[in-house]
């Protein structure tokens, strides 16, 4: 299953293994079991420290466990972890084989101190770019603590479980048989949910921090660039981010970041964070801004965080980005994750052979419809305007597909369901005011982004669309408070533009520090 290049790369990685690894597969007579068998035999042939057997008795077939002789590690993949999950498999092999994790010593200690029984199950799809973060975090926890058990399950191969648990979005995480969470989660976020004292400990540590020269709020491309440019000036720099990478984490293919011909959002997000870590920057993850208290004359700005802590700084750069725009119609929140979705790449495979709608006729919506058409039975694209707004080449491709129906001049008015999952949607024909219903099982919302500025209302000046109004240097209406990226009024929401704006705001903040601290 592995081509020569991939096999060579994997062999090189496996040279880092220092302890023996046992791969035990549970297989049946199906084609997927044969595929998995061949893959595991191939992997075992690449290292003398790896042994393989097909003597497993697990009920999920095909599946396999990874263990270290004499250790109590419960780590299993149910399915064939290729696609986005191949990296998860490689990391699991390395970690079971004794190669140290990149997690901080503090996080490792926190994992090892967990008491109780934690039986995790994660449902993923091979095309989901959000799933590996969850799978890799829980795999590491299973390697480090015998109280943690983890099974990563390919929902496409175990449809009976997906149906019985009514899973309609990935990643979906279960703990001890109960729903634990849905969507991307990093290691620290998972630990924060099961280690109930973690939040209070973190807030105490944050409150004890000295004031920053530059505090960046947000960890997307704009925030990362701002932090690097500030740190390179040798000034005290901090980043408070809900999740490092921001909206980039939810982006699949990126082909317009200059000098990088092609990459994926999660890879770029990791690269951004690693670049920031090369400098003396205090990164505070899982921190969401709740209030901005502007400085009194000669004083410090204060950013209050949702976890109860607060930070002070001489200058602040707001780079909180944007989030998916919602339809705000009845039924949307009720059926979110139960048929209403926002990531076609992640959740599309769960709707194989079913009927879905895509809301939005811009590039994102049309691209989503094209992608989904290869998986689902029928796609209905619904656009509010009288015509699609996507690029002509995308529209031509869309209209060439036999299982796509386009409805324009349509206002979605309600998501319909049976109490458990989506069964359809209702829309109004804007030209006749007639109401129509479409029977379907999934709705993918692709209608743009909203700036994350709710917490800033009443402080910095906002545009009618809720964006932070900035001047040519990124200065907001509050002296010493700057903003950059998708959260601002700067047009064209692009990664490369956000990076430039972050750098510019940081340079402007440094200039402000020089001018306000200079002797009279």
UniProtKB/Swiss-Prot annotation:
Belongs to the class-II pyridine nucleotide-disulfide oxidoreductase family. Transmembrane segments: none annotated. The active site is a redox-active disulfide bond. It is an enzyme of class 1 (oxidoreductase). SUPFAM superfamilies: FAD/NAD(P)-binding domain (SSF51905), Thioredoxin-like (SSF52833). Its cofactor is FAD. Homodimer. The keyword Transit peptide does not apply. The keyword NADP applies. It comes from the Bacteria. GO terms for biological process: response to reactive oxygen species. NCBIfam families: AhpF. This is Alkyl hydroperoxide reductase subunit F. NAD(+) binds at residues 355-369. GO terms for molecular function: flavin adenine dinucleotide binding; NAD binding; NADH-dependent peroxiredoxin activity; oxidoreductase activity, acting on a sulfur group of donors, NAD(P) as acceptor. Binds 1 FAD per subunit. Serves to protect the cell against DNA damage by alkyl hydroperoxides. It can use either NADH or NADPH as electron donor for direct reduction of redox dyes or of alkyl hydroperoxides when combined with the AhpC protein. Keywords: Disulfide bond, FAD, Flavoprotein, NAD, NADP, Oxidoreductase, Redox-active center. Gene3D superfamilies: 3.40.30.80, FAD/NAD(P)-binding domain. Disulfide bonds join 343-346.
């Amino acid at each position: 299953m592995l081509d020569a290049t991939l096999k060579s790369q994997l062999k090189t990685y496996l040279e880092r293994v220092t302890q023996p690894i046992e791969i035990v597969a549970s297989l049946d007579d199906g084609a997927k079991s044969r595929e998995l068998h061949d893959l595991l035999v191939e992997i075992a042939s690449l290292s003398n420290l790896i042994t393989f057997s097909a003597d497993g008795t697990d009920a999920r077939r095909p599946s396999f466990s990874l263990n270290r002789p004499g250790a109590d590690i419960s780590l299993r993949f149910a399915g064939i972890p290729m696609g986005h999950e191949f990296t998860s498999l490689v990391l699991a092999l390395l970690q079971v084989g004794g190669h140290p994790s990149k997690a901080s010593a503090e996080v490792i200690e926190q994992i090892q101190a967990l008491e109780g029984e934690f039986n995790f199950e994660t449902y993923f799809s091979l095309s989901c770019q959000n799933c590996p973060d969850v799978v890799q975090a829980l795999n590491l926890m299973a390697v480090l603590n015998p109280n943690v058990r983890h099974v990563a399950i390919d929902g496409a191969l175990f449809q009976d479980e997906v149906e019985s648990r009514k899973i309609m979005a990935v990643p979906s995480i279960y703990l001890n048989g109960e729903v634990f969470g849905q969507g991307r989660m990093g290691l620290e976020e998972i630990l924060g949910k099961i280690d109930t004292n973690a939040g209070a400990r973190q807030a105490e540590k944050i409150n004890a921090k000295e004031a920053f020269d530059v505090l960046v709020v947000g960890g997307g491309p704009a925030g990362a660039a701002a932090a690097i440019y500030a740190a390179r000036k040798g000034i005290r720099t901090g980043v408070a981010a809900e999740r490092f990478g921001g909206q980039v984490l939810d982006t699949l293919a990126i082909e317009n970041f200059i000098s990088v011909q092609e990459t994926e959002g999660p890879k770029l997000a990791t690269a951004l964070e690693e670049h920031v870590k090369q400098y003396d920057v205090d990164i505070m993850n899982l921190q969401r801004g709740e209030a901005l208290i502007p400085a009194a004359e000669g004083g410090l700005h204060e950013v209050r965080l949702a976890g109860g802590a607060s930070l002070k700084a001489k200058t602040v750069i707001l780079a909180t980005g944007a989030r998916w725009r919602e339809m705000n119609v009845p039924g949307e929140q009720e059926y979110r994750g139960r048929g209403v979705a926002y990531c076609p790449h992640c959740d599309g495979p769960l709707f194989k052979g079913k009927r879905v709608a895509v809301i939005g006729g811009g590039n994102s919506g049309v691209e989503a419809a094209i992608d989904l058409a290869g998986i689902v039975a029928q796609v209905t694209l619904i656009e509010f305007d009288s015509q699609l707004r996507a690029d002509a080449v995308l529209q031509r491709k869309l209209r060439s597909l036999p299982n796509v129906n386009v409805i324009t001049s349509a206002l979605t008015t309600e998501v319909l369901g049976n109490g458990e999952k989506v069964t359809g949607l209702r829309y109004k024909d804007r030209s006749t005011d007639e109401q129509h219903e479409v029977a379907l099982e999934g709705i993918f919302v692709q209608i743009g982004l909203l700036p994350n500025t709710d917490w800033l209302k009443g402080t910095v000046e906002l545009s009618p669309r809720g964006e932070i109004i900035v001047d040519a240097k990124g200065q907001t209406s509050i002296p010493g408070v700057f903003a950059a990226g998708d959260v601002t009024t700067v047009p064209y929401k692009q990664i490369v533009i956000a990076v430039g704006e972050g750098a510019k705001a940081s340079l402007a903040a440094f200039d402000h520090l020089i001018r306000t601290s200079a002797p009279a």
